[in-house]
Amino acid sequence: MVVGSTSTAKSDFMKPELTIVLPAYREEATIEVCLHRLVKLLDDKGISFEARVVVDGPGDQTASMVRAFPDSRVSVIELERNTGKGFAVRRGFEDCTTEFIGFIDADLDLHPEGLAIALDLLKSSGPQVGGAIGSKVHPKSNVEYPLSRRVISSFYKKFVKIGFSLDLNDTQTGLKVFRSEAIDKVLPTLKCNGFEFDLELLCKLARNGFLFIEIPVDLDYKFKSTVNIRTGIKALVSTFWLAIYLRRN
């Protein structure tokens, strides 16, 4: 267990097949609507699931709103301080007993139907396919977001292509589903707390022989992201050190 966090879970009688982790930071304005949207989509698709909202530090009423959400399949994990998306997702992955586990950004800028697409592909694939991951550059993706984000994203993708031996076009889109057995192999070794977490996770899964399927996504960008030139530079620096770490280990 991670020191410095508490969890509130509600009982459910049917063992789910999919655990969805939603890292959340100050999402009180949208979390209730997003959870209703997520639950309806998964129910309509006939997917048995549990959803874990990991609130990445105090600051608003996100946690209390999740606790009050009227569905026993939704739980909340509260972190005592803001530690980063990677730490939040790792915390949500802990003690998972479902066959599949994934994560999606809590604001649902990415349409949650991608989770159903990813799950179907994993079910129909062999065990060597460890994950199905969203890709904004997939030819069937529907993506509209600001030029500044496009520039940062394009530069970052080129940087990743140079520094890492991954045959993937997009490592950072916040919608991914994995086989839990794959996650179990690498979870104890994961170190990254920030946005570079996705890249570390994929690299370590690839080292363990797992393959990936890239899937299209629909992105409805709501213009509230904190990603800018400064955070882009910070991400590049963190990714540079991750490349060095992975080469040495």
Regions found by a protein language model. Give the residues of each.
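Hydrophobic helical membrane-anchoring modules
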Residues: 1-16, 163-165, 189-249
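Conserved donor nucleotide-binding strand/loop of the catalytic core
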Residues: 49-52, 63-95
